[in-house]
Structures are given as structure tokens and as C-alpha cells.
């Protein structure tokens, strides 16, 4: 904690206000149960939030939870396709899809679907994927082998459903190329967040349908 304080808060008057404690699940549960901690702010998975929130509320404590997300974007027939593609790539592949604000579902009007998909596939194919320590790299590895294996498993499930998968090849170790999945319907696989660079693309006819698709997820 001393190193963190000196690096990020060099002018902090009361040094003990900031403390760093290393730990895992057991330490998190202890903090959730400890009534001396008035506000618990936790960042992690939805499962983590579901586990911690009842423990904090049981002692009438306050909780602030930054959890997962299954974010969607609707591309209308009037969209600037080139601008849309830039925004999609930025939102879907940054930090290798490992952030709660990652774009995971793309809902595209049928009249611009083919044009957008052509440009999007081209953009994905040109992504610099690999070693994060190289300046030219845009997409680095997943956090561990378990995450990489989970991504590959989900892509295999998508293929088994008859969906078309672009990308998703293993580059090396935990590094996997971002994937685009063209889906015919929003099944449970798509409704469940995978913390990885997988972008599901769905087609829509009218705005009401697009909004219904967008909102039909639990997250």
C-alpha cells in the first residue's frame, strides 16, 4: 500500500486512509460481513455481486457493485456505416473484450447488414493481435487459460447451433483472435455474457423488433 500511495497519491495527508490488502474469495467475504466497513465497493462478475450483496445487506451495510454487462448496439438503416464500424471495433475488441462496458451484441437493420458485415469482417481481419508489450498490438491475451478455453467452448457451441463464426483462432497461449458470430436468433448462449472478445450479430426488420432484441437479456 505504501508503493501505491506514493505512486498515485503522493500528496495524501493521512497515509493510513489508503491500504492495499491482497487476498481472494475468503478476504472478500470477510469484508462483506464486517460491520466496520460502512460501504463496500466491489468490481467483478455478476456472480460475485450476487454472492456479496446479500451478505452486505444482511448487516444493513451499503454496497456499490460494478459487475458484468451484455451490452448491445442498434445500427439503423440511416447509419454512417464507416463510422459505425469504427465504433463497433473500438467497443467490442478493446481490452480483449474483458471489461463490463464491452460491446457484445450488434443488432443491424437488414438493408445495411451485408455492407456492414463486409467492412466489419475486413476490420477484424486486420487487427494487430498478440503481445501487449509490443506498441503495435491492439488486442492482447485473455487473463488466463480458463478464460481462453471458455471463449473457444462458446464459439464451438455457436457453430453447433449453425451460426457462422469469423475469427476466434488461437494465436498463442491465452491469446485468441476476436470473433464475430452471425446468429439467426438471440438464444440463451447470446443472452449470457462471455467475458471475451465475442461479438454476436443479429439482423432486424423494424425498430420495435430491434429494441425488443436489445432488451431481452437479464444483464
Which residues does each predicted region cover?
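Conserved glycine-rich beta-strand-loop-beta hairpin in the small C-terminal domain of fold type I
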Residues: 137, 173-175, 192-198, 217-219
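Short, conserved active-site loop motifs that form the nucleotide-linked donor/cofactor pocket
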Residues: 18, 162-163, 198-199
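Short, contiguous strand/loop micro-motifs
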Residues: 14-15, 39, 141-142, 197-198
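Short acidic alpha-helix that forms the nucleotide-activated donor recognition element
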Residues: 29-35, 191-193, 212
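Active-site phosphate-binding strand-loop segment of PLP-dependent enzymes
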Residues: 17-48
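ALDH superfamily catalytic-core signature
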Residues: 6, 33, 39, 47-185, ...
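PLP-dependent aminotransferase-like
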Residues: 1-26
Amino acid at each position: 500500500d505504501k508503493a501505491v500511495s506514493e505512486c498515485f497519491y503522493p500528496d495524501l495527508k493521512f497515509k493510513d486512509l489508503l491500504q492495499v490488502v491482497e487476498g481472494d474469495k475468503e478476504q472478500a467475504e470477510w469484508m462483506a460481513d464486517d460491520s466496520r466497513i460502512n460501504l463496500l465497493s466491489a468490481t467483478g462478475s455478476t456472480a460475485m455481486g450476487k454472492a456479496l450483496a446479500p451478505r452486505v445487506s444482511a448487516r444493513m451495510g451499503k454496497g456499490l457493485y460494478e459487475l458484468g454487462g451484455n451490452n448491445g448496439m442498434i445500427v439503423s438503416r440511416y447509419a454512417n456505416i464507416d463510422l459505425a464500424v469504427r465504433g463497433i471495433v473500438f467497443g467490442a475488441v478493446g481490452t480483449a473484450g474483458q471489461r463490463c462496458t464491452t460491446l457484445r451484441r450488434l443488432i443491424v437493420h437488414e438493408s445495411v447488414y451485408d455492407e456492414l458485415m463486409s467492412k466489419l469482417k475486413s476490420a477484424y481481419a486486420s487487427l494487430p493481435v498478440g503481445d501487449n508489450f509490443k506498441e503495435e498490438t491492439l488486442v492482447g491475451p485473455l487473463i488466463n487459460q480458463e478464460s481462453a478455453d471458455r471463449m473457444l467452448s462458446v464459439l464451438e457451441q455457436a457453430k453447433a447451433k449453425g451460426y457462422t463464426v469469423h475469427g476466434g483462432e488461437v494465436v498463442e497461449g491465452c491469446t485468441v483472435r476476436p470473433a464475430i458470430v452471425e446468429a439467426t436468433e438471440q438464444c440463451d448462449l447470446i443472452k449470457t455474457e462471455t467475458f471475451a472478445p465475442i461479438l454476436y450479430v443479429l439482423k432486424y426488420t423494424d425498430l420495435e423488433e430491434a429494441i425488443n432484441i436489445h432488451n431481452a437479456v437479464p444483464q
